[in-house]
């Protein structure tokens, strides 16, 4: 779960945006500037990232769900891969307004998606006309693109992990309304407001995004492993107690 300063430097996490595009609220996390580009202070980023990883691990250990959100071209694939590796839901296409605050409606769309997949798999569409089958294929493709990553989400998540807060303001606003903790990478051109676990860093470099997402996914897997170990230990202790009580003097 550990991340080093060297890894962050090699991934270019310290490169911010042009100095003319900046949020004064990010000033505490800026080291200086070079060639009109803000340089992020990784001595501040590293402990903050580690705090985010600890929180992530704790949520996973409590069998919680963390929703990965990254819809920018350069982060989309990374977010989907790392979320899938950690066994968590993700949104890598456009964020649909109300995904969190109107989850009941979204749940209806998720049911439709699953029903359509089952029907297609069962060969039900073969009985339809060519036009009807094509329409269903198009509808299914749209649903899979928009909701495929959250297909198995049964309720609102316990936390969300966001890459690029400016790109996902609606997601953060919805999470804030519902009291869902937000873990997010925040670059120098955006405000960290509404983020509970701030990771000040470059949100444009693919290498940097891989580092963040990989770290979060690893923390989740470690948390899950701890949870399983605790259950096994509890079961073992219970069996030992049962044997002890069942002994006949």
From Swiss-Prot:
The keyword Ribosomal protein applies. It holds the Pfam family Ribosomal_S2. Belongs to the universal ribosomal protein uS2 family. GO terms for molecular function: structural constituent of ribosome. The keyword Ribonucleoprotein applies. Gene3D superfamilies: Glucose-6-phosphate isomerase like protein, domain 1 (3.40.50.10490), Helix hairpin bin (1.10.287.610). One of its GO terms (cellular component) is cytosolic small ribosomal subunit. GO terms for biological process: translation. Keywords: Ribonucleoprotein, Ribosomal protein. This is Small ribosomal subunit protein uS2. Coiled coil: none annotated.
